[in-house]
């Protein structure tokens, strides 16, 4: 894991605890994360993120909603250029091969009431 390899749960947990502390009783805590770009189904794009998402749900009591947040571009070339910049050349190649002007994207919204 490239982010907080040994103590990510303690660090993320501390951030979530602070979020809960500053949220009014009855308020909603919200975490927004990716569930995939350039894919036809929602899911964690890596094993470390799968572990993190499961931890949010099981250990921290968050409920997940999945929403489509596709990117829409005027041309295939614009789509390839922009997605290549943000997501790397592999996705840019897929965009060109599939002639996509609409890039599929899934976003997870985890929430929990305080």
Please provide the spans of the model-predicted regions.
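A short SAM/SAH-binding and catalytic strip from SAM-dependent methyltransferases
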Residues: 1-11, 35
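Short acidic/glycine-rich loop or secondary-structure boundary segments that cap or lie
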Residues: 3-5, 38-41, 73
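A short glycine-rich, Lys/Arg-flanked "PGG" loop and its adjoining helix->strand segment in the class I
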Residues: 9-26
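Soluble or luminal CAZymes and related metallo-dependent hydrolases
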Residues: 11, 44-48, 104
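Structural element of the ATP-grasp superfamily
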Residues: 19, 53-57, 112
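Conserved class I S-adenosyl-L-methionine
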Residues: 27-58
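Conserved Class I S-adenosyl-L-methionine
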Residues: 58, 63-114
């Amino acid at each position: 894991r490239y982010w907080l390899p040994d103590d990510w749960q303690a660090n993320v947990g501390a951030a979530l605890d602070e979020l809960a502390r500053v949220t009014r009783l009855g308020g909603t805590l919200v975490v927004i994360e990716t569930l995939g770009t350039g894919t036809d189904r929602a899911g964690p794009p890596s094993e470390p993120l799968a572990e993190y998402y499961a931890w949010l749900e099981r250990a921290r009591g968050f409920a997940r909603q999945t929403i489509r947040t596709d990117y829409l571009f005027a041309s295939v070339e614009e789509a390839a250029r922009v997605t290549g910049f943000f997501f790397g050349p592999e996705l840019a190649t897929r965009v060109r091969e599939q002639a996509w002007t609409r890039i599929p994207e899934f976003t997870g919204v985890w929430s929990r009431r305080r």
